[in-house]
Amino acid sequence: MKLYIIGNGFDLYHHLPSTYYDFRDFVKEKDPFVFGIIEKYFDYTGAFWHAFEENLSELDEFQLIRDILRSLGGDGWDEDALESYDPIFEYYTIGVFCQLKNYMIDWVRNLNLLPLSRKYPGIYPDSLFISFNYTNTLERHFHIDPNHINYIHGNAQKEACDLIVGHDMDNSNIF
């Protein structure tokens, strides 16, 4: 019996569009509003999507709050307004994170439907697998028993999917 440790390189080897740049394109097409918030309020240097998981902690909350207050007729910062508009802030922060996670699940499920243009040789079905991927490439294309696969970050194909995306600095506990 062998032990395989599988990461995104495995899906990339099979020509699956599974980079975070591919996810960026998916979000941009699916929801330009959420995409715009990400581009504007995260520490966006052009490389945000390259280090997507790490950069999730870089939300510029103060700029977001100032912009929301201005859009509601305020001057950009008002301590008293913070409490009154708390549901709006939650929508823009937690709501966007939740939507982003839902898009991640949709995107991975779409990846799971794609055919492989080539197959990695030498995968032994009776082996054990540790997978850092969200995709079901091993199950779908190599017919690996799901009981032989430990999905470290979750499996998007499961009905009650709870993907782990990002870092341990997620104060909202969404990712």
Question: Where would I find each of the regions flagged by the language model?
Answer:
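SIR2/sirtuin NAD+-dependent deacylase catalytic core
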Residues: M1-F175
